[in-house]
Design a protein with these regions (language model features):
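Conserved catalytic core of sirtuin-type NAD+-dependent deacylases
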Residues: 1-364
Length: 364
């Protein structure tokens, strides 16, 4: 039996804070300006859960790099797809919890950091973005600045919760349609979801849209099969969200595309992530091996900290603060429609902290 564990990080930073971490914000923003200028519009950005905390979506890890919810036990990929009575119960448990957990993620709005990142793309300073997040917030932010934005400029490394597909035939549909099907088949759960929305007393939601429920019997919960399979009169297949589960690997297409983006980039800007997952860490490792300049702006220890000895620069601070100051200065001396678009939305965005998050903005 293969043992699969949730990626963890050291309890303490592997390297002491650098001089970049203690620079006043204006000087930190000036350093970012120099980094992007040298990138000449070919800098690629890599983001993680930390950038979505201010949108009310809890990060996996806190400011010290420790797992924020050590008692949380997500469904692993092999459990979800197991063809047995046990697997059937895992699917009931996953979809019941995700049915309640998806609406807060679906309804979340971009925060200022998402707007800043979209601005860097829209201005052509760092047009390509790789994100580990599955919350769709980067796309929402970019579409505000540019309704005709290129979807190909954002690569979702771990997929998106906004879509689902069946495993046997790869029939894809919007998540909202599947949510409606779940609600129709589970009226009691649907009423619970509506009550939670009315009162605001939603259970704790994790970044993958799963929630914590205790003492619940999932046997009465019905998981809809793929309706497209039924319409096409083929064997119905189980449905999963378009996200990479723990224990599942990213597709070869996404892996190759992400590595190609790094190979073609002039530099790599990392924002709000501890890089605990190998699929993201591998990209930084590749950039270092290719001698690309790398700047990381995030809080707490990360898996990539040893790369500081190989030339990676790290600012141990909240990314949004630096990005916002940099863009304030950048748009002062620039002109054009893109600049006007950015000015219109620059300091907008909704800040809605997760109810149980206190202190500094965690960037996991």
């Amino acid at each position: 039996m293969v043992r699969i564990s949730i990626p963890t990080l050291p309890k303490a930073p592997l390297v002491p804070p650098s001089g970049l971490s203690v620079l006043p914000i204006p000087q930190a923003a000036a350093h970012l300006a120099s980094f992007l200028e040298k990138g000449k519009g070919k800098t690629v950005m890599l983001t993680g859960a930390g950038v979505s905390v201010d949108s009310g979506i809890r990060a996996y890890r806190g400011e010290k790099g420790t797992y924020s919810n050590p008692n949380y036990k997500p469904i692993l990929f092999h459990e979800l797809v197991e063809d047995s009575d046990r697997g059937d119960m895992f699917r009931r448990r996953y979809w019941a919890r995700s049915f309640l957990g998806y609406p807060p993620v679906r309804d979340a709005q971009p925060n200022p950091t998402h707007i800043y990142i979209a601005a860097l793309q829209h201005l052509g300073l760092a047009p390509k973005l790789i994100t580990q997040n599955v919350d769709n917030l980067h796309r929402k932010a970019y579409s505000l600045l540019s309704p005709s934005y290129k979807e190909s400029n954002i690569l979702e490394l771990h997929g998106t919760l906004a879509k689902v597909h069946c495993l046997k035939h790869r029939h894809e549909q919007k998540r909202d349609s599947y949510q409606e099907e779940i609600a129709r088949m589970n009226p009691v759960w649907d009423e619970e979801a509506k009550e939670a929305e009315r009162t605001g007393r939603r259970p704790r939601t994790n970044p993958d849209g799963d929630v914590e429920l205790h003492g619940v019997d999932y046997r009465s919960f019905s998981v809809p099969p793929c309706r497209i399979c039924e319409q096409e009169k083929v064997d119905p297949s189980m449905v999963k969200p378009n996200v990479v589960f723990f224990g599942e690997t990213i597709t070869p297409r996404v892996r190759d595309e992400s590595l190609n983006l790094i190979a073609e980039a002039s530099s790599l800007l990392i924002l709000g992530t501890s890089l605990a997952t190998y699929s993201a860490f591998r990209l930084v490792k590749s950039a270092i091996e290719l001698n690309k300049p790398v700047l990381m702006i995030t809080t707490g220890p990360t898996r990539a900290d040893p790369f500081v000895e190989k030339g990676m620069e790290k600012m141990d601070r909240v990314a949004g603060d630096v990005l916002g100051k940099y863009l304030d200065e950048a748009v002062k001396t620039s002109t054009g429609q893109e600049v006007e678009d950015v000015k219109r939305y620059l300091h907008t965005g909704v800040v809605k902290r997760p109810p149980e998050v206190e202190g500094p903005r965690a960037e996991g």
